[in-house]
A protein has these predicted regions:
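Conserved acyl-donor/pantetheine-binding loop and adjacent beta-alpha core of acyl/acetyltransferases
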Residues: 55-59, 63-98, 104, 154-159
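A short beta-loop-alpha structural element at the N-terminal edge
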Residues: 2-16
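Cytosolic beta-strand hydrophobic patch enriched in CBS
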Residues: 46-52
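Short, solvent-exposed loop/turn segments that connect beta-strands within catalytic domains
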Residues: 52-59, 170-173
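Conserved catalytic-core motifs of GNAT/GCN5-like acyltransferases
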Residues: 68-71, 131, 141, 146-162
């Protein structure tokens, strides 16, 4: 499968909302309006995976997004309030890493994560943070993330784990 990773654009939001709805339960998924607010506030923090079609690239099959923040862990308010975004924030947060079901296990999620890690390094961030469910801890550890334990976040009524990747501490495998 041929695909490319590119910067997200405001005109992608409807497609991103469809991908998000396919990847997360309704209580956890960001809706189109929320994604539009995020894209407007921090477009530089969105990357999309686009599959090559007969007419060229165009079908969005995945994306990654999050705000730049000063905190080392994600709090629930960050998902709804774009005011937490700081252009010079110490950490790149990851609110979602989404790949449609039929395109999973083909390296798309890893390519998106590696692009976000590369971008955070280029911007001089101290590292990246995210929350994940217990079944995904091992996946994120492959990128150098460290598990900080159960998160204070109860987003969507789920149990989340705080993960951090800190550059310059021997954990950077990006």
């Amino acid at each position: 499968m041929a695909y490319q990773i590119r910067q997200g654009r405001l005109e992608d939001v409807t497609d991103l909302a469809e991908v998000e709805a396919a990847c997360f339960p309704a209580a956890e998924a960001a809706d189109e309006e929320s994604l539009k607010e995020r894209m407007t506030a921090f477009p530089e923090c969105f990357f999309v995976a686009e599959e090559k079609t007969e007419d060229g690239f165009g079908k969005i099959i995945g994306f990654i997004n999050g705000a730049d923040v000063d905190q080392q862990t994600i709090c629930d308010e960050m998902f709804e309030d774009t005011g937490w975004h700081k252009k010079d924030g110490r950490y790149q947060s990851i609110f979602g890493l989404d790949v449609i079901g039929s395109k999973r296990r083909q390296g798309v999620a890893a390519a998106l994560m590696n692009r976000m890690i590369e971008d955070a390094k280029e911007k001089g961030r101290a590292g990246l943070i995210l929350t994940c469910k217990d079944r995904l801890i091992h996946y994120y550890e492959k990128f150098g993330y460290r598990n900080l334990g159960v998160s204070a976040s109860v987003h969507g009524g789920a149990v989340w784990y705080d993960m951090i990747l800190e550059f310059g501490k021997g954990q950077d495998k990006g």
